[in-house]
Regions:
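C-terminal edge and immediately downstream basic/flexible tail or linker adjoining helix-turn-helix-like DNA-binding
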Residues: 2-8, 101, 137-140, 154-167
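Structural recognition of an alpha-helix C-terminal capping motif at a helix-to-coil junction
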Residues: 35-42, 46, 56-68
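Amphipathic, Lys/Arg- and hydrophobic-enriched alpha-helical face
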Residues: 12-30, 46-47, 63, 111, ...
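A short, charge-rich alpha-helical start-of-domain segment used by transcription regulators
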Residues: 1-21, 34, 45, 119
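Internal acidic/polar
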Residues: 80-104, 131
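Arg/Lys-rich amphipathic alpha helix in sigma70-family domain 2
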Residues: 46, 50, 64-86, 100
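C-terminal flanking helix
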Residues: 16, 20, 41, 115, ...
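Helix-turn-helix DNA-binding module
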Residues: 112, 116-120, 128-148, 155-159
């Protein structure tokens, strides 16, 4: 189904904040999330003619593009780290990890210690309030698997918050 540039601009404007928030939670870094948000929308614009609203909402589709963009970024970072380690270069990570305005230090610390998969499902279901079907589509899993993953991620988050406070 063909969609116009106007439709893309409308969807981009409507869902920009959600995509950015998803990427902040996924990466744990506002600066990286901003770069990936720009890359996500550049990729989405190139692929917009393939978007079919009968297969899901624009928000879900854009989050799928964002997830793919983030995975590409993580793979590139891993390749970079391997190259640096191979040549014994020690390059410090100089970015600030910030998950969101108003989070307690305990919760922010707990989220930073969680896996990207756990942060992603929490961001999609809790922060962006996507249903299990939409979040599952973004993550490439069934709605049931998405609900299970969320439940387990929230249990791990609760343990992390408890261990962070006790430490």
């Amino acid at each position: 189904m063909k969609s116009s540039a106007h439709d893309f601009a409308e969807a981009a404007e409507r869902h920009l904040d959600d995509v950015h928030a998803f990427l902040v939670y996924l990466t744990g870094d506002r600066n990286v999330a901003e770069e990936l948000t720009a890359e996500t929308f550049a990729r989405a614009l190139e692929r917009w003619r393939r978007y079919d609203p009968r297969r899901g909402s624009a928000r879900t589709w854009l989050c799928q593009v964002a997830r793919s963009t983030a995975l590409d970024h993580f793979r590139a970072e891993e390749r970079r780290r391997r190259r640096e380690n191979r040549f014994s270069l020690q390059v410090p990570e100089a970015h600030e990890v910030v998950f969101g305005e108003g989070l307690s230090p305990e919760l922010e610390g707990a989220l930073s210690r969680m896996s990207a998969a756990d942060r992603a499902v929490i961001a999609l279901r809790v922060v962006l309030d996507l249903d299990a079907e939409s979040a599952g589509a973004v993550l490439g899993i069934s709605p049931t698997a998405c609900s299970t993953r969320l439940s387990r991620a929230l249990q791990r988050l609760e343990k992390e918050v408890g261990s962070g406070v006790a430490a």
